Each structure stands twice: as structure tokens, then as C-alpha cells.
Amino acid sequence: AMVFQSYALYPHLTVAQNMMTPLRMRDLDRAGRLPLIGPLVARAAHRKMRDQVAEVAETLQITPLLDRKPGQLSGGQRQRVALGRAMVRAPVAFLMDEPLSNLDAALRVHMRAELSELHRRLQATFVYVTHDQAEALTMSDRMAVMMHGDILQVGPPNDIYLNPASLDVARFIG
């Protein structure tokens, strides 16, 4: 599942509908995806999807937001909705491309802790792309330092910080 810095939420759909979209596309046929008759045609599937969305929303503490539209949410709330849309599919891996870059500094620190806790709880693989050394060092259990498309060093953050493989890695890590 993928999470981007731009959130990629549908502005005309509610939080619940945004989170349900990948499930609808994966689990329903054409008739089941139709706006008015879909819920009637595939009642059991729709009920199961609503339950999955509710469970993930509870995990991310966004249950009170399920009936709101993205324009009514803060940046951190939008980020959690985008993450929830990825989580609801129960993927084995997450690809996150600069997911916190649009947030203010205080919210970034808070979301770092939330994502780290989520990673521990889900036990899924997270590939996390960031240009922020603090994010990389605090959130990862294994990291790769890349420059100009080349991998310069791979290892636990503490090893990379204490024993940089090159001057470029040392400059980047600080």
C-alpha cells in the first residue's frame, strides 16, 4: 500500500468513503460499486467493508471524522486518513514517500511517534522515503542512505550514525 506526501484523498467523498475505496475496487464487481444500488446488491460485502473501515479508524483515532470530507480536516487528520486508506487493505508492505513533509514541526514529531508505534503493532514492512535525517534515524530499524540514485550505506541507524561509510554519508547524517 502506498502513502504520499500529498495524501491523494478524494475531496468529494467522506473519510469513510475514502477509506473504503480500495476495498470497493478490490472486493466488488461493477454492480456492487454502483452508488445507489451497490449497497443493495452486495449487502454483506458492504457491511464487511464498513466494519474494516471502523476498525482501522478506531486504531488511528479518527472515528469521529468518518462523516467529514477532507477539506474539513487538519493536515494531521488528512495524513491519518491516507494512512487508514492504505491500512484497510491489510497489506504486507507499506511504501511511504515523504508522508510527513506537509506537516508543521510539532505535528511531524507527533506523527513520527504514531507511525513508529503503528509499525511495531502491525509488524508489516515499511519502506519510508525521507530527506529528513531525524525522521530516518528515529523511525527506522534499518536504513539506506542514497545519493544521486546510488546506495551509499545500509544498516541500523546507530551504525550509520557512528560509523559512516564515506564522507558523503557523514555529511548527510550530520
What is the predicted function of each stretch?
Residues 9, 14-168, 171-174:
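ABC ATPase nucleotide-binding domains
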Residues 6:
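Serine-hydrolase catalytic-loop signature spanning alpha/beta hydrolases and amidase-signature enzymes
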